[in-house]
Regions:
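Active-site beta3 strand of CheY-like receiver
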Residues: 6, 49-59
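Helix N-cap/capping motif at the beta->alpha junctions
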Residues: 34-47, 69
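Conserved acidic segment of CheY-like receiver
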Residues: 4-14, 19-23
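Short amphipathic alpha-helix used as the core "switch/output" element in two-component signaling
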Residues: 70-83
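A Lys-centered signature of the CheY-like receiver
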Residues: 115-116
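Receiver (REC) domain active-site loop signature in two-component systems and cognate sites
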Residues: 64
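Alpha4 helix (beta4-alpha4-beta5 surface) of REC/receiver domains from two-component response regulators
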Residues: 71, 85-87, 95-112
Length: 127
């Protein structure tokens, strides 16, 4: 299923802009939403309306203030299955820590780990 929306959660607005450009370069009609505050992103996702079956790609930074990407995933794990089934989570990080990569691979709700920067080739691999 082709994703209907790309959501980026990263406290760095410059990275969010770069993600937007890479995504729109590969998927010109992509719906894009960016959050610099992971709590607001989580509120948005957890309030997703019932009956909305659209698929969303969620690109999640690891190192953020207040909530890390791992905190976000921990709370996401507790959401209703109907909501979780609409999201494919990818950790998008500049971290070169192998523990982060391993943790992403072991998480049941994280599809993959992607190193920054997001490029149009990496976007293509998500589709």
């Amino acid at each position: 299923m082709m994703p209907s929306r790309f959501i980026v959660v990263d406290n760095d607005p410059v990275n969010n802009l770069l993600c937007d450009l890479a995504i729109r370069d590969e998927v010109s009609d992509a719906k894009f939403l960016a959050f610099t505050d992971p709590l607001k992103a989580f509120d948005h996702i957890s309030a997703a309306g019932e009956g909305n079956n659209s698929m969303n790609i969620l690109l999640l930074d690891i190192n953020m203030p207040i909530w890390s990407g791992w905190d976000f995933v921990e709370h996401f794990d507790k959401l209703d299955e109907e909501i979780k089934s609409r999201f494919r989570i990818y950790m998008l990080s500049s971290s070169i820590d192998n523990n982060d990569k391993q943790r992403a691979m072991e998480s049941k709700n994280v599809v993959d780990y992607i190193e920054k920067p997001l490029t149009k080739e990496k976007v293509f691999s998500l589709l």
